[in-house]
């Protein structure tokens, strides 16, 4: 005996008269368009924000540009533990550690510090895993959300650009 070919018979769905002419679908689409038109033109509830003049209010959970925090004495919190670099799924963080010498001991609480700390915003997916992984609370995604620029070099954040200013507010937790 040989192999038997199995044929599956498919019956076509009979379209009704309104399905054939797509009147129902066209009417449904026009109704949605009419609702948006009434909201925008008659009720004056626009969805668009006039950007340069009006700024959008972001929620407290918004993940903006990366910032690095200082402790209460104004020292850098980052101790080059590499937790943020290892957990980053986009591999956007690069850290070079350095030993703390006595001349800069007042700037760093531990025995090593981040000599070079860079975040490539072109690779970053703003997932917030670096913020969660940091045991010292040094990195936060609470900076501005406006990151438009003309050059690619401006989208590579260095430690100096991310570091919180000395004397600024000390924020230890996301508010």
Curated annotation (Swiss-Prot):
Annotated residues for binding of [4Fe-4S] cluster 2: 88, 124, 127, 130
Keyword Thylakoid listed: no
Coiled coil: none
One BP annotation, GO: aerobic respiration
UniProt main location, coarse: membrane
Keywords recorded for this protein, A-Z: 4Fe-4S, Cell inner membrane, Cell membrane, Iron, Iron-sulfur, Membrane, Metal-binding, NAD, Quinone, Repeat, Translocase, Ubiquinone
Keyword Transcription: no
Membrane topology: Peripheral membrane protein
Cofactors that this protein relies on: [4Fe-4S] cluster
Domain called 4Fe-4S ferredoxin-type: residue spans: 69-98, 115-144
Binding-site list for [4Fe-4S] cluster 1: 78, 81, 84, 134
Subcellular location: Cell inner membrane
Catalytic activity, EC: 7.1.1.-
Role noted for this protein: NDH-1 shuttles electrons from NADH, via FMN and iron-sulfur (Fe-S) centers, to quinones in the respiratory chain. The immediate electron acceptor for the enzyme in this species is believed to be ubiquinone. Couples the redox reaction to proton translocation (for every two electrons transferred, four hydrogen ions are translocated across the cytoplasmic membrane), and thus conserves the redox energy in a proton gradient.
Quaternary structure and interacting proteins, as annotated: NDH-1 is composed of 14 different subunits. Subunits NuoA, H, J, K, L, M, N constitute the membrane sector of the complex.
Family: Belongs to the complex I 23 kDa subunit family.
Name of this chain's protein: NADH-quinone oxidoreductase subunit I
